[in-house]
């Protein structure tokens, strides 16, 4: 993948950055694509770096993801809850599966979606082959993960656990407005204001 380079004028001349490093200067982390261990490690490292720089200043996590590996996503989620710096989440494009859980895990009042973004929740997917006993062990693990993910989603949204369990039985798609009603996000952003805020 080609990563754009941006050039900035500084007192010492020109300086070039890859686009993600430049965004990081403004405390912006971009999660684009499926969540796996490699992506999770990059996102976590950036969060820890920004936390060390200023633990009181917001971190902005932009999400455009179809989801991915549950344990990788939970590593990001737990780091969001662990650090002191508030993490604002913004859905651009889509936040599906683990992406939706991460979106809901942002600081309350600072979870956003762009106008035409799509949000989708569902139960975790899994596949395993091998001996019958091992298949049974993995099936039990998936059921435990499903229960925990539903509990987290219920806690983050304010929905009853029974409703979340019913809604995640199959793919459950939402618009930004529907995700706001559900409690996954707090507001829909249409454009940045000149002062850097949103409206």
Curated annotation (Swiss-Prot):
It is found in: Cytoplasm. It is an enzyme of class 3 (hydrolase). One of its GO terms (molecular function) is serine-type endopeptidase activity. GO terms for biological process: protein quality control for misfolded or incompletely synthesized proteins. It catalyses: Hydrolysis of proteins to small peptides in the presence of ATP and magnesium. alpha-casein is the usual test substrate. In the absence of ATP, only oligopeptides shorter than five residues are hydrolyzed (such as succinyl-Leu-Tyr-|-NHMec, and Leu-Tyr-Leu-|-Tyr-Trp, in which cleavage of the -Tyr-|-Leu- and -Tyr-|-Trp bonds also occurs). Keywords: Cytoplasm, Hydrolase, Protease, Serine protease. One of its GO terms (cellular component) is cytoplasm. InterPro entries: ClpP, ClpP/crotonase-like_dom_sf, ClpP/TepA, ClpP_Ser_AS. It comes from the Bacteria. Its EC number is 3.4.21.92. The active site is at residues 97, 122. Fourteen ClpP subunits assemble into 2 heptameric rings which stack back to back to give a disk-like structure with a central cavity, resembling the structure of eukaryotic proteasomes. PANTHER family: ATP-DEPENDENT CLP PROTEASE PROTEOLYTIC SUBUNIT (PTHR10381:SF70). Belongs to the peptidase S14 family. Cleaves peptides in various proteins in a process that requires ATP hydrolysis. Has a chymotrypsin-like activity. Plays a major role in the degradation of misfolded proteins. This is ATP-dependent Clp protease proteolytic subunit. It comes from Geobacter sulfurreducens (strain ATCC 51573 / DSM 12127 / PCA).
